[in-house]
């Protein structure tokens, strides 16, 4: 009898954890199927925003305005077209030189380092970041600065061949993660994501899930925020050994990615592997095909390589 009650409680608690979206995982997969069929609609909305920004940039009357619009264009192209995002980071650098503004130069350099890191140019990204004098950085750039170091060292650790090198890169990742926690506002999305990441690294999966769910339940989150939160939730469930939780939150993350029209993402590819393992071959192929097409359009070479290896 006690065993039956325990199983019942476990099922109820699981339902509460997945209740925020009020959809079953199967319903989420069907939603993804529909979004993939019509994903050009979301791409058209993004292209319209980009066209408007380019028009504003062309009509700008000062370098300050041009710098701002180039920044917005960098943000729009981030995870959408990496070559274009790099072009606008370079334009920001040119304008910063012209205005002789050191903080603008540092911001542009970090934009370029971000793109380099995303495309696997880790050495070049670290060299560029190394040219920035941390002592002269304004407060508003510290979070971005530490975030880039943490992300790049984390990626280098993921792809390191030897255990010794992997351990060193992860040690550096830990250092910059702690630095990030010191500068991010405690109620910010960035702080919650980094803190949850730290909990996951230290096998405190339930605590990570708790804080992520608390933030996820906030109203008016944009798709990008939802994508990051739910992907991190999926990692917490994966490491707990809860495949259903992992699948559920990967599905939510994939939906948010597709709706925000980003092309450089991970969730849909990982979800494809899970549904493949369950024997849903056609759906897995469709998800991988979509992921490969988007990665190719984005010029996300690392993602293209990862997906090609699955094929």
PLM ranges: what are they?
Residues 5, 15-311:
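A "functional boundary" signal
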């Amino acid at each position: 009898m006690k065993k039956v009650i325990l199983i019942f409680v476990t099922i109820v608690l699981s339902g509460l954890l997945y209740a925020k979206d009020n959809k079953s995982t199967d319903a989420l997969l069907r939603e993804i199927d529909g979004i993939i069929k019509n994903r050009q609609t979301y791409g058209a909305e993004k292209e319209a925003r980009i066209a408007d920004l380019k028009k504003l940039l062309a009509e700008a009357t000062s370098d300050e305005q041009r710098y701002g619009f180039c920044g917005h264009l960098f943000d729009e192209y981030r995870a959408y077209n990496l070559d274009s995002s790099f072009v606008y980071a370079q334009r920001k650098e040119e304008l910063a030189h012209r205005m002789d503004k050191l903080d603008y130069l540092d911001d542009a350099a970090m934009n370029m380092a971000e793109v380099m890191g995303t495309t696997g140019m880790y050495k070049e990204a670290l060299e560029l970041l190394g040219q920035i004098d941390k002592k002269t950085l304004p407060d508003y750039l510290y979070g971005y600065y530490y975030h880039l170091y943490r992300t790049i060292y984390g990626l280098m650790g993921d792809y390191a061949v030897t255990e010794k090198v992997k351990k060193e890169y992860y040690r550096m990742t830990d250092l910059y993660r702690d630095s990030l926690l010191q500068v991010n506002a405690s109620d910010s999305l960035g702080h919650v994501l980094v803190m949850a990441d730290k909990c996951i690294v230290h096998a405190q999966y339930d605590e990570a899930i708790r804080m992520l769910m608390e933030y996820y339940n906030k109203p008016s989150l944009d798709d990008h925020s939802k994508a990051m939160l739910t992907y991190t939730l999926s990692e917490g469930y994966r490491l707990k050994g809860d495949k259903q939780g992992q699948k559920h939150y990967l599905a939510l993350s994939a939906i948010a990615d597709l709706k925000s029209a980003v092309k450089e993402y991970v969730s849909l590819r990982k979800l494809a592997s899970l549904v493949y393992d369950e024997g849903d071959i056609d759906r897995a192929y469709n998800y991988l095909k979509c992921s490969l097409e988007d990665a190719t359009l984005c010029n996300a070479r690392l993602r293209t390589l990862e997906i090609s290896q699955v094929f």
